[in-house]
């Protein structure tokens, strides 16, 4: 059972959160991730031809660089973005994982993983396609997915 204390003090100049725990565990990590995600973007602007769309970030399966353009792929649409992948990576919530130089994946859409003999990870996504991680990001991917 976790206990919550809230202290409102008009003399404070900024809001902050202290976490007191006997040890680091999944609940504590979930709280940290949720707090870190508060300042992250939850919507993005995407383009299909000359149409401008507001995209809910949680609907995005993957962000890929296609023909030098960053593309947000949802279950039924592909949207071009005006951001670079590294800029996007800074704005996204914790459940997005950089898996290669040209792709960021929403971990909630990963269905299964296959470790390839060459050391890469093949990721099967819920939209029935798969993608590969690059070796450079392998350690980070394993940490983020707890494998």
UniProtKB/Swiss-Prot annotation:
The keyword DNA-binding applies. It is found in: Cytoplasm. Gene3D superfamilies: LytTr DNA-binding domain. InterPro entries: LytR-like, LytTR_DNA-bd_dom. It holds the Pfam family LytTR. One of its GO terms (cellular component) is cytoplasm. This is Uncharacterized HTH-type transcriptional regulator SACOL2360.
């Amino acid at each position: 059972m976790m206990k919550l204390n809230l202290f409102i003090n008009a003399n404070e100049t900024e809001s902050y959160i202290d976490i007191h725990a006997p040890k680091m565990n999944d609940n504590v990590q979930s709280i940290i991730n949720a707090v870190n995600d508060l300042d992250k973007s939850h919507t993005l602007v995407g383009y299909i031809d000359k149409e401008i769309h507001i995209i809910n970030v949680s609907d995005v399966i993957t962000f890929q660089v296609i023909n030098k353009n960053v593309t947000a792929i949802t279950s039924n649409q592909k949207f071009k973005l005006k951001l670079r992948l590294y800029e996007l990576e800074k704005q996204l919530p914790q459940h997005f994982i950089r898996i290669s130089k040209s792709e960021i994946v929403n971990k909630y859409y990963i269905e299964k993983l296959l470790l390839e003999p060459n050391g890469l990870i093949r990721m099967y996504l819920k939209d029935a396609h798969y993608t590969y991680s690059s070796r450079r990001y392998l350690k980070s991917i394993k940490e983020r997915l707890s494998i």
